[in-house]
Amino acid sequence: MIENEKNKDSYRAQFPHTENGHIYLNHAAISPLSRKVTTALRDYLDNRSFGSVEDFETWMQTVDETRNLIARFIHTNHPERVTFMGNTSDAISAVAEGLSWNDGDEIILNSMEFPSNVQPFRILERFGVKLIYLIPDDEGRILPNQIKKAITEKTRLVSISAVQYLNGFRADLKSIGEICNQYNLLFVVDGIQGLGAADIDVTTCRIDALATGAHKWLMAPMGIGFLYISEKLMKQLSPAKTGWLSVEVPWDLTNFDQPWLPVSKHLETGTLNISGIFGLNVSLKNFFDIGTDTVQNEIGKLVDFTIERLQDEPSVKIITPMQPQDRAGIITFSVNGMDSPDDFVNSLKSNGITISAREGYIRISPHYYNTTDEIETVLNLIFSS
């Protein structure tokens, strides 16, 4: 057991599933909701059902507060550049479809990406846009110099996941951002496997668009996420969608010829996911109460422990990068002789243990409240199967 891990009782008390022996190590897919989050959701729903029902003033205060919390979380002094979105795909699509493209323009991606960071750009091929897929090195990494070498006079944009969903590789966003700035390229980051497990500083990293859903490491409800847009990108982006809230005075209902809002607000076209925003609000406050550094350090300790334990097993092949700076919260590996990782994962789930199988590999993704004892239990089951 990691030193001071016994102090996790207060963390674990927030997650009821830990009380019935359920071991949950699949936060790269979806996270459990804390008691604080479910209480906030219940209060909101109770008010809709039994209370004042319509409470727009309180709701809008929570929306504004949550926007400020997000800005603080990603290190920007510009909450007005944060747009609420339903998911990562919506957010990346807003960027891809909001830019003007020319025949022959190039976008640099990589072959490891989750489809959310590919399909919104692939549809641009109808305009003659060319997608350049970089191949990871032998350690499963896409390094900044590789991106630099792929840049041509036709390159317009680089998009990469902060952390790759399969092998858990964590990109050097700061160095990539510097390269994009040097060549005047737009820099887009899919943050869903990073935010909550690793720090992402949009200012230091010169990120033009940070897109994410919040149901994974951010531990919020499904169907809520956000898009951060830099000043540079705002000047180039035209809204890909429009609604009644996209104008300066939306409640001037009969005045159709109104000025449009800036693009970041323009994209919030209609009724927001208020319940999701309430949940995200409380979850972000919990991160700040615990300390974002503390959360990331706890995850790092668990990942280090898991990798060290796996390295003792000759039947294991780890595809997660070995250097701590190259990973965040995901550990992915194969086990020689395991016929079907999917069947094995399903058998564990029927016994109250949740991990995941992806592309023929086992993937474990612990959060700050998990313990080494839980990980040891899972690994013992894997190696005794």
Cite the ranges covered by each PLM segment.
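Pyridoxal 5′-phosphate
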Residues: M1-S385
